């Protein structure tokens, strides 16, 4: 017999998102194009409502005979992810309207993708995990190709779909091997299952499939092309909410599902982390397209986050939450900034086009500078403290070579971060920027204040000694 109270405690946000998605479909089908403009505001409110429900049920629970299980670790991630998704929907309408592709299906797809995020974060069974991943992925493929009249957007969606399907197949095959050699798909059962060669091989395949979802090297090849070709508000969504959720799911799988065999996967995750940091820091140096540059930046930052995963549950989980929270907020702000910059009616795409931004729009340039320096991890901004926590976790876990790579990669990546700032502040303006939309400007400034200032001032309370440790405590037995 189903326990309604347990279901609500464990899955209130997902139930809300599923019901809201169905309502959006019905209203959109009945009202038609008249619902297009309102749908974005409704979609954003739906996401903020899901975040509020996650906060209300922060302690989590278990439902459906163990298929679903939530903790403070996953529910904290839901609060951040759903909030970022709501902001991403809110930012999208102006861009889509200018390109004449504003339709109610866009916020609907965002809601369904967020439903997938909620499911993977709540998963306590391999089948639930796969169902959530596919719900998120299928919505993401369509979002990447949402600008149907753009060849680049269609190409991005096709590449994402083909490579994503391959990664899903690898993940599913790995899960089937794990099930075949252990006899269970339950996370709780797998934690107690004995170690076997077949199950370890399945674990490696699952790591490969999940590494694609977080765009970690060497499974990163889709990221620059998709980031460049997909509509900018879609990329802002990809780089924030699903990125954060996927990183936490990766950590959750490693810490809970395979926590008892950490000695078998620690080196694999460390190698992926090292490759991601190297590829991300070096790859960005040659980029002229802003979105491709930020794609390589995201690959490097995934590598930094995986250092925390390789450090293990006790040391790594709080560091992962601290670093990832600051990074995704900064990343959303940066893409909102890219979304805001326009010249001659078109988007600013190349770094050289940023010339003179500080002279024309000083407030906007200051906010962008704070966000860039935060992502770069320079003190005294929030990103520095997040990266410091990851570095400390790596050193305490005796992953000294990985910590050295982290420091070197951070220094190398400064090359393209400082290049952005040099063009913005010191290059001569070539053309006048169009006026920045007040809503987008407010979002950029808010992200800069949160990521660059709030974390800088209150890092003692907000860091691994405070909320991050409390949220990560949900992983402890």
From Swiss-Prot:
* Membrane topology of the entry: Multi-pass membrane protein
Transmembrane parts of this sequence: 11-31, 38-58, 76-96, 107-127, 161-181, 192-212, 235-255, 265-285, 298-318, 319-339, 364-384, 398-418, 440-460
- InterPro entries hit by this protein: NADH-Q_OxRdtase_suN/2, ND/Mrp_TM
Q: What is its main location?
A: membrane
Q: Extract one GO BP annotation from the record.
A: ATP synthesis coupled electron transport
* A Pfam entry, by short name: Proton_antipo_M
- GO cellular component terms, A-Z: plasma membrane
Give the coiled coil ranges.
none
Name the chemical reaction catalysed here: a quinone + NADH + 5 H(+)(in) = a quinol + NAD(+) + 4 H(+)(out)
Keywords in UniProt for this one?
Cell inner membrane, Cell membrane, Membrane, NAD, Quinone, Translocase, Transmembrane, Transmembrane helix, Transport, Ubiquinone
Q: What is its EC number?
A: 7.1.1.-
Gene Ontology terms, MF aspect: NADH dehydrogenase (ubiquinone) activity; NADH:ubiquinone reductase (non-electrogenic) activity; quinone binding
Q: Where in the cell is it found?
A: Cell inner membrane
In UniProt terms, what function does this protein have?
NDH-1 shuttles electrons from NADH, via FMN and iron-sulfur (Fe-S) centers, to quinones in the respiratory chain. The immediate electron acceptor for the enzyme in this species is believed to be ubiquinone. Couples the redox reaction to proton translocation (for every two electrons transferred, four hydrogen ions are translocated across the cytoplasmic membrane), and thus conserves the redox energy in a proton gradient.
Family classification: Belongs to the complex I subunit 2 family.
Complex formation: NDH-1 is composed of 14 different subunits. Subunits NuoA, H, J, K, L, M, N constitute the membrane sector of the complex.
Cited HAMAP family: NDH1_NuoN_1
* Database matches in NCBIfam families: NDH_I_N, PRK05777.1-3
Protein name in UniProt: NADH-quinone oxidoreductase subunit N
Protein source organism: Hyphomonas neptunium (strain ATCC 15444)
């Amino acid at each position: 017999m189903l326990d309604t109270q347990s279901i609500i405690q464990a899955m209130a946000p997902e139930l809300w998102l599923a019901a809201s998605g169905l309502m959006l479909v019905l209203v959109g089908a009945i009202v038609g194009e008249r619902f297009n403009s309102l749908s974005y505001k409704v979609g954003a409110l739906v996401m903020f409502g899901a975040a509020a429900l996650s906060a209300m049920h922060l302690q989590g629970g278990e439902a459906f005979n163990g298929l679903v299980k939530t903790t403070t670790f996953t529910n904290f991630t839901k609060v951040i992810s759903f909030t970022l998704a709501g902001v991403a929907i809110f930012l999208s309408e102006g861009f889509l309207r200018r390109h004449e592709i504003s339709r109610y299906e866009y916020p609907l797809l965002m809601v369904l993708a967020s439903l997938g995020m909620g499911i993977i974060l709540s998963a306590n069974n391999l089948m639930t995990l796969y169902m959530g991943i596919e719900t998120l992925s299928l919505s993401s493929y369509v979002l990447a190709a949402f600008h149907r009249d753009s060849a680049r957007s269609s190409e991005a969606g096709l590449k994402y779909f083909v490579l994503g399907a391959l990664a899903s197949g690898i993940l599913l095959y790995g899960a089937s091997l794990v099930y075949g050699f252990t006899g269970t798909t339950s996370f709780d059962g797998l934690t107690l299952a004995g170690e076997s060669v077949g199950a370890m091989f399945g674990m490696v395949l699952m790591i490969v499939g999940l590494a694609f979802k977080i765009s970690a090297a060497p499974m990163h090849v889709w990221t620059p092309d998709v980031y460049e070709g997909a509509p900018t508000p879609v990329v802002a969504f990809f780089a924030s909410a699903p990125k954060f959720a996927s990183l936490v799911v990766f950590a959750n799988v490693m810490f809970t599902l395979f926590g008892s065999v950490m000695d078998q996967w620690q080196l694999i995750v460390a190698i992926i982390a090292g490759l991601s940091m190297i590829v991300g820091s070096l790859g960005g140096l040659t980029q002229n397209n802003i979105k491709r540059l930020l794609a390589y930046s995201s690959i490097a930052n995934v590598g930094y986050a995986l250092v925390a995963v390789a450090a293990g549950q006790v040391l790594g989980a709080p560091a992962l939450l601290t670093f990832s929270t600051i990074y995704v907020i900064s990343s959303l702000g940066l893409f909102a900034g890219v979304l805001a910059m326009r010249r001659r009616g078109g988007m600013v795409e190349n770094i050289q086009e940023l010339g003179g931004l500080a002279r024309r729009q000083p407030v906007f340039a200051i906010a962008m500078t704070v966000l860039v320096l935060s992502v770069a991890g320079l003190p005294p901004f929030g990103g520095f403290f997040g990266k410091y926590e990851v570095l400390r976790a790596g050193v305490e876990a005796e992953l000294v070579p990985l910590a050295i790579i982290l420091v070197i990669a951070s220094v190398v990546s400064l090359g393209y971060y400082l290049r952005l700032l040099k063009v913005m502040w010191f290059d001569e303006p070539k053309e006048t920027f169009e006026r920045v939309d007040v809503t987008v400007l407010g979002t950029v400034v808010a992200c800069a204040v949160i990521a660059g200032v709030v974390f800088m001032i209150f890092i003692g309370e907000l860091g691994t000694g405070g909320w991050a440790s409390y949220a990560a405590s949900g992983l402890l037995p």
